[in-house]
Amino acid sequence: MASGKIAAFRDFSAAAMPNVLRLTDLISEGKLAGKRVFIRADLNVPQDDAGNITEDTRIRASVPAIRAALDAGAAVMVTSHLGRPTEGEFKPEDSLAPVAVRLSELLGCEVKLVQNWVDGVDVAPGQVVLLENCRVNKGEKKNSDELAQKMAKLCDVYVNDAFGTAHRAEATTHGIAKFAPIACAGPLLGAELDALGKALGQPARPLVAIVAGSKVSTKLTILKSLADKVDNLIVGGGIANTFMLAAGLKIGKSLAEADLVGDAKAIIDLMAARGASVPIPVDVVCAKEFSATAAATVKDVKDVADDDMILDIGPKTAAQLADQLKASGTIVWNGPVGVFEFDQFGNGTKVLAEAIAASSGFSIAGGGDTLAAIAKYGIADRVGYISTGGGAFLEFLEGKTLPAVEILEQRAQRQEALA
């Protein structure tokens, strides 16, 4: 990694997260031995109808914080939400029981599941317990101070290691951090913020963003935020169709939002005014219908017919964009550029994914469809950082304050003032 990139990363970290206390700081200072540590993790994993965990990435990602606290001699409590339970009404399908089993396998020790834990938890140093689904507790979603104060009394140290919920102000992500004796960021949360800071703070140039998806409306704030920052803004999917309309091109019966053409044109003009660009496709892959068996036809953009649906970028466009990505210093990737679930409309996403993997620049990727594309094309080990954040990742790109991070910043400043 070039020294310039490291410097950019450090500069942004200092600016974006002033003095946020980290779990690693406490461990290096020997401050966890014998302490009660409450870790808010993100263990919200998918399950099949029988309750079997189908994908355990989030559980595996939570292990380093838990292991570090155990090794430091702490009594460890871990909680998470799972699904969308009704507060005050616990149902079997809301239980973290399968997660407790998987955690015990990964940690190599017993992980007891504790019900009705708000008023007290029995755990000894060197032990870890999993506290049942925190969203079952009344007041969790509304960030109740009463609930948060009860939870804060359970611990000496609160650790937020759940970047995926950092955009939500809830009792276990925000309220408890106000009242716990010490509040800090865990290694997963810290790594997410470092990676995002590296990509957007003082990034190595050129900075290229890929923002794709079906609708401009859902990502308009992100597009406008990035238009101020990036050198190239690559758009894909239905979003690209709206930008093609803004550029005066025909898109047939493709998915687009005619009412947002003005916004798209404003973004194109804003980028052009500062010497940046929104590359408009020169060729596209069309079909007459949206289906897994639809025949794919490559066309120049000027040849799109009235009954065509654009379902991918064409090979010339993909090659041009791949060259830009390979030459970039920093890449932010959110969304596939075509309907990659159907192989005949997946070439654009595949070519860009391989270009990102081949780039010597720093890359960060996030969003469910993006992660699925990374898995499909086997490039996970060649992406600089893969965000587990989902909604939090998108809100960071929008330039929004993440409540769970903001409270850690405030606590760090208070803790420093008292030191």
Swiss-Prot record:
Any single GO CC term annotated in Swiss-Prot or TrEMBL for this entry: cytosol
Keyword Ligase tagged: no
Binding site for ATP: K219, E341, G367, G368, D369, T370
SUPFAM superfamilies found in the cross-reference section: Phosphoglycerate kinase
Subunit structure: Monomer.
Uppermost EC category: transferase
Cellular location(s): Cytoplasm
Pathway involvement of the protein, from the record: Carbohydrate degradation; glycolysis; pyruvate from D-glyceraldehyde 3-phosphate: step 2/5
GO process annotations (BP): gluconeogenesis; glycolytic process
Annotated protein name in UniProt: Phosphoglycerate kinase
Taxonomic lineage: Bacteria, Pseudomonadati, Pseudomonadota, Betaproteobacteria, Burkholderiales
Gene3D superfamilies, sorted: Phosphoglycerate kinase, N-terminal domain (3.40.50.1260)
Keyword Cytoplasm: yes
Annotated organism of origin: Ralstonia nicotianae (strain ATCC BAA-1114 / GMI1000)
Binding residues for substrate: D42, L43, N44, R58, H81, L82, G83, R84, R135, R168
Chemical reaction(s) catalysed: (2R)-3-phosphoglycerate + ATP = (2R)-3-phospho-glyceroyl phosphate + ADP
